[in-house]
Every structure is written in structure tokens, then in C-alpha cells.
Amino acid sequence: MSHPQRFQRTPLAAALGFALLPLVSSPVHAQLEEVVVTATKQAESLQDVPISVNALSGDSMREQGIMTFDDYVDFLPNVSDAGNAPGMREIYIRGSATEQGSVTVSSAQGSAPGVALYLDETPVSFGGRNLDVYAADLERIEVLSGPQGTLFGASSQAGTVRMITSKPALGEMQGRVDVGMSSTHGGDTSSNVEGMINIPIGDNLAVRAVGYNNRQGGWIDNTASTFTPSGPVIDRNSLGYGPYFRNFPDTVIASVSNQEEVKDDWNEATYTGYRVGVKWDVSDDWSALVQHSSQKLDVEGSFLIDPSLGDDMSAKFQPESNVDEFDLTTLTIEGRVAGLDIVYAGGYLDREIDSLIDYTHYNNGGGYITYYLCSGNIYADPGPSNQNTCFDPRKAYSDTTTNERTTHELRISTDQDRRWRVMGGVYFSDVETKTLGEFQYYSSGDAFSDFQVQYYGAAAQSPYQLANETIPGVAGTNKVGPTGPLTTFYNDYTRTEEEIAFFGQIAFDITDNLTATIGARKYDLETQLQGASNFSFGCRYGGNGGGGADAGFCNSHRFSNSPTDRFLALGGYNNGSISDAQFLGLLNYPGAEQAYGASAKEMFRGGGSNAATLQAIKEGRLDISSINGSGVTEEDDTIIRVSLDWRISDDIMVYGIYSEGYRPAAQNRNAGQLGSNQTGIYEGYVVPAVASTDELENMELGIKTELLNNTLRLNASVYSTEITDLQVARFDPSNVAFLVFLENVGDAETRGLDVDFMWAVTGRLTLSGAASIMDTELTAINKQLQGVAVPKGSELPLAPSFAGNLRARYDFDIMDGNAWVNAALVYRGETVTGIVGSAEFMTDTHNLAYGNEPGVSIQDEGGTFGTVAVSNGSLPSNSRYVNDAATTLNVGMGYARDNWTAEVFVNNVTSEEGYVVQTAGKFTPESSMMRPRTLGLRFGYSF
């Protein structure tokens, strides 16, 4: 198969909106080809779909070197993303951004994403840890802006991204090999190889297989550094918890060097995987497709930099890694019966993630740091030793997460040529996520040793098993046996989500040119969080608290926390099966009374008590209305979508849309806990049991045109979106709780304009571009978040007021082949980071801990942040970090002859840094950044 001339390729390789496709032209003619998409679960021309849809063809992705999640997000003006590294990101569309929790808790305590990610017909969304599918042998990527909930369900709140794989082709032998290599300025080399083969077997059966390996070299250096914990920082974060840091004259504070972890270009990522598909045309009316995809993403090092150190540098004290593997098996059956089209799509996703993250920065924010870090006279009452020592401050987080998802969808539709067109279906999804997250503190064994000798005498042996094992008999836990000697705290959770939904859509041609469409989705959704958080508080507070642990163990289950039983209690009280008196007598887990007697802890301890939680329920400060007697949060609702489209002519269509979207509620593991600080704005504060569903309503007007004899395609849409009860993740150890939790910050709205065009100026020159103008605003702040979140009227994070791109491509004939040159200019405007927290407070922490400024701009949002004072004695401002505007330029030139292609390219010609500050789960700022200037070569052969 020869390399296609420009505009002589398949429709899906045509130029599309948002400048996603490379610029295209043909020496023969300049008309743009039709583009076919399945954004409405029906094959339709892009220009006939009354939705803002963008598509990127497989040919275009290969020509532009678009291979990963980061690559294809970069060229979408109304799309932004944030996160730590490949496989640890979140995507946002049209400014509907929030604040996702840290990756250390996203599996156990994260919000569902607001943008759904699909691989073919299967949803693969995961909050905070997007499934980073390598773009090998894809037919196209479709990006649907605005709520798509009626057809695509939960998490299609702000939009949907669909990755459509190339299917086996019947009756044709095909193959392709692509290789490439590149070098990043100041960094390592990268390489990739991909291969595809399509084999027909008879007339009605075909097999298609693709395999790939892509290694992306690093450019960030982990530099030599020394860390010494700061007493003033520790003291102010201990507010409400203690113990305070007691800096006696003879106190020894250990420092730590990261010399063993110093390495150049240490942020590497390697994608390795394959996909096999078999298609069988059973008859003229029925076909079946089975596919299996498997991938391993292996990330080494950190993709975050410390902006105070300068460009391209981090200072981590532990090795970092993220191994993310998935297997996805899907079955699609299509048929026709009695004039009805029938489609069944089923899938099973099995994903496993193993992560290791440096957690030494927790010394700058944890509420109990002196407890874990120091021994001796750090309390008002001296300990068993007169020595005052703070030990090795290194900390690490180790995580193992498994995610299993089973989906089934059956839909039926009528003939699309009729005046009345109907589609209806049923959808079922069952998701289970298990996570074991171990927080490993190097200091704890030494800090606890004197106390263990006091309680166990000669029988005490070091190192101690600090966190023994999960509370026995608690549903949803997965750990068997003790943890390692450094594990001081760990999460052991199972999250489940089960949904059944019925959906339908009716389209009616009022006239030949005017069509009305109405769709609806009725869903029933059940979510549950089970398991336990396990502490080592028994290692100091009375040894094992009378629990009788064997020598060498110091954990006490009486200090552990069981969300399983918290939600059973809250649900039982909600349905009346638990009385006030019974609620007041609840203990932290079943059997605690038998194990610990009078020393057993109350279930809702922390900053409060069972009585305080009960009072919060009675006063309406703690909503438990959605929790049933089994501890499950139940939601059911119906969302709708209504559109009207008018085809003014064969080349112009205008449309209007009203649509709704949603994402699931989320349970909190510390549900019902009273905040530790009950003064000022925190008076009466209680951790929500459930962060309720946040809902999005969208109104949109759009136009789609093909002008100048189909040489110019111009599409635009203007929209207004309202979000109710926006979910946000929050970590406030100084005032509320040292566990991350979710809550609803308030309401928001976004308004904007999206424009894209493609213009075949001549038979050889093509221009394309896209722009997004957005205005976002928090329109209401819930009472409990006033003075904690940014004030009403503030903009949403990661939402630039302007973003755009412009591309040009020129084709010409030379040496019996086709050559081209292209360029792409991408601009993304200034944004801010976060909704809850104070940039001034984080900067002050950085100054105290490291003795220098973090080097990041701050935007004052007005007022003060309700937390402890900064070092000058005043309350910090309600402020956020600023991400500066960034402009990147990519250029390339290539040549194709017969079955061969070759291209040389330079991406990010000016080495634009494009910093985005990351604050979620952090105590001093870190930033992600763009890959610097990269020069490379690509070669391809197809047959």
C-alpha cells in the first residue's frame, strides 16, 4: 500500500477541528474529505453531528508523532490536564476543573473523574490515574466536549475522550512497521518501534495484531541535597494533635542526604504492549469482534521538579517508580433483526498498579511528625530516656492497587433513514478497586524503641513490626499477615461501584432541514468504601494498650479506623435500626471491647466523639440520608439531553443543546469525624460522610460550515455551564484531620467559545487552527468551606482564559515522491492551581524548611486563609500559585515514496518550560514541565 497523497486518503484522515489533524493538501485538488465519527454511537459525518466533536486519525497521529496521553492533550485548546507523571494524570474539558487528591490516596479516597475515557466501547476512567493507553494502530481519537451522560454515563460530566482501535480488515493483507528515535536537549535519548499485521482468513474472517515498545528518555536530574526537619514547621502543623517539638539544648536532630539517589535524566517511561483482534462476519446481518489489549507502563524517577532549584531538577530522598499494567478483553456483536440494528458490547478490564513515591516532604505537613520522628523529652512529661533525639527523616509511600471493571451494554436502534429514529439500551457496570498503601517511616523504630523496652523489657526486639496487620474480621480488607519493619501507617481498602442504567434517544425530522432530538438516562448507582486505616499509635501510648501483642510488635488495633463499620453505623442510624444509645456506645471495630475492655476507642474519635457526631447528625451538619443499612451510598436520578439542529443549506448547520452530566458520590474513610480545631471558621466542622454527586448543566449553540467549495471547514460553539456541588479533595491536618477527605466546595459556572477551522488554501498548502476562550467562576461557597476555599467569584483552576493553536503544512512533489514541511504553534494562557489551601502558607513552609523561596508566582484571591499563622505571626492570604502562559513551536519535514516514509522533526523548538504547579497532597510546591527541545527521526514501511 503506497503512502497516500494529501486529500486522497480515507475520510477519517481528513482535517478536523481543534487542529488535531496535521495540515493536509493535495497537488490534485483541494476539497476536504468527509469525516465519519461515532460520537452518538451511530456512524455519521462530523459535520452532521449536532455536538462539538473533534477527531484525530491514526495516520495523522503517526505523522505527528502523537503516541501518548500527554501528546494528544497538548493540541486541544479547551482541554487541560494535571498530575505527577505518565499514568498519574487527570483530564479536564472546558474549564470544569477541580482539585484531585494526591496520588497517594487517589485509589483509596479519590473522586471519580469528570471526563470519561473510553477504549472502543469500554469505559476505562480512573480518578487521578488515567489509563495511559499508547496510541498504536488507532483508527482515531474522538473528543466530545460538554456533558455526554445520556449516552456515555457516569464521569461523562464535562466530556468524553474515545480511543477507537483499528479493526481487522476482511479480505486484505496489510502490514506496517514504524521506528523512531529522538534526543531531548539536556536529557537522554528516546526510541520506539511498532508493528502491525492484518491477516485475512477466507472471505469472512480476519486477524489483526499490533505490538509496540516505546522508551521515553528522561531529562530531569535528581540533584544532591540534605534535609533537616524544621522545628517551627513541625510545631505549627501539630496544632490540635501534638506532641509539639521540644527543642532542648541537647536535642539531636538527624539530617539526611540523598546521595544514593542522585541521578541524571532519571524520569524515564517505557510503554510495552500488544493488541490482537479477530473479526468474523457470521452472515450478511451479523458480525462478531473479539479483542484483547495488554500493556505495561514502567515509569522510573519523578516527573516533578522543585522550582526553587532551577530548571529540570528535583531533590528526592527515595527512589520513585510506577508500574502500571492492564489487560482488557472485549466482545462486540452487531446484527440486524426485523429492521432493527442490535449492538452488544461487553468488556473486562484488569489493571494493577505498583508505585513507590518519596514521602519525605510529609515532615513539612504531618500533624504527628514528632511522634514518629523523635524520642526522649519531646513531651511535657519526660519519656523513659533523658536523651532528646530526632531520627532519620526519610519517608516513602508504597502502593499496590488493583482495578477490575466488568461492563455490558445492549442497544437497539431503528433505521437511521427514517423520519423518526429511535435508539435505546441498557448498561451495567461493576467496578472493584483494592488498594494497599504503606507509609514507611525510617525513624519510627528508633523513636519507639525506648518505650518498647519500658513495656516489654528484654523481650522487646528491634526492628519492630510497627503496623501489625489489618483489623481482623473487617470486610473490605486485603492484607494478610504483618507489614514490613518500616511501615508505620497504611490504608487497606476496597472500593466498589455498581451501576445499572437505561438510556434512550429519539430524533424526529420536523422538516427536511429541521431535526429535534431528546435523550434521557435513568441510572441507579451504588458506591461503597470498606476496609481500614491502621496506625502505630499503640507503640507509645501505653505499649500495646493491654492488647497482648507478641514481642517485636507495637501496633494496637484499638487506634485503627474501620470505615466499613462507620458506614454500617451511619446507615443503621439512618434507617432506624441503631438507637441513640447504641450509637453512643459504638467502638472502632467489632470485638474491640473484648480485646481492650475499657481502653477500647470510640468509633468517631479523632477531634470529637460519638456524642459529637450524633449531635452533628441531629443538627443537620452531617448528612447521612443516602447511606443504607448495608453501609452503601445509593443514588438514582434521570438526566436528559435535548437538541435542535437546522441545516440551513448543504454546507451550513446550526444547533442548540441542553445537556446534563454527573459523576458518582464518594464516601469518606473518616466520615463523621469532628474537626480537631473547633474555633473560628472551624467551629462545628465535621468531615462529610459522603461527598455528594456534583451535577453539570450545559447550554450550547453551535455552527458547522463547509465553505468555498468545500475547501474551508469552520466550526464554532458558544456554551454556558453550571456545576452544582463541585467535589474537591482536601487535606488539612492542622485543623480537621490527618486523613485526606472529599467534600463539595460549592457551585461554579463556565462560559466560553470554541472555534476551529481547516482551510485548503491551494492544492498544496493547508492551514488549520483552533481557539478556546473561557471565563470560569466559583458562584457559591458552601458554609463550611468559607475561609478555607478561595472566595466566591474566583476562577476555577487550570482553565486558561485563552488557548489556541495554528498549523500549516505544504506538500510538494520531488524525486518521484511526495515531500512536506509542517509547523505547529501552540499557546496556552495563564492559569492558577487549586481551590482549597493557601499558596502563601506553602511558600512560608518552604522558606522555613529549606531557607529559600520556591520561585513560583502567587495570586492573592482576597481575604485570609483560616489556618495557623505564618512565620510573621499573621494569617496567610487566601492565595494560589500561578502557572505562566506558554507557547510552543513544533516543526518537521518528511518524504514518502512507494511504501516508505521518513521524517525529521523538532518539537518544542524554544524549550518552553510550561510549568504547572502541583499542590495536591503536598506541603511545598512542585511543578510538572514540558519536555525540552527534542530532535528526532521517524521511518515507516507499509504494505
Per-range role (PLM):
Residues 69, 90-92, 105, 143, ...:
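N-terminal periplasmic accessory domains that precede
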Residues 105-145, 195:
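Short acidic/polar hinge/loop motifs at secondary-structure boundaries
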Residues 185-299, 325-328, 402-408, 413-429, ...:
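Transmembrane beta-barrel wall of Gram-negative outer-membrane proteins
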Residues 279-284, 413-415, 425-429, 495-721:
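Structural signature of Gram-negative outer-membrane beta-barrels, strongest in the C-terminal barrel
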Residues 332-360, 645-671, 690-744, 749-751, ...:
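Membrane-embedded beta-barrel scaffold of Gram-negative outer-membrane proteins
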Residues 372, 386-409, 681-692, 698, ...:
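Outer membrane beta-barrel strand-and-loop segments of large Gram-negative receptors
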Residues 439-440, 444-446, 825-849, 886, ...:
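C-terminal beta-signal and adjacent terminal beta-strands/loops
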Residues 512-516, 711-723, 741-837, 938-942:
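Gram-negative outer-membrane beta-barrel transporters
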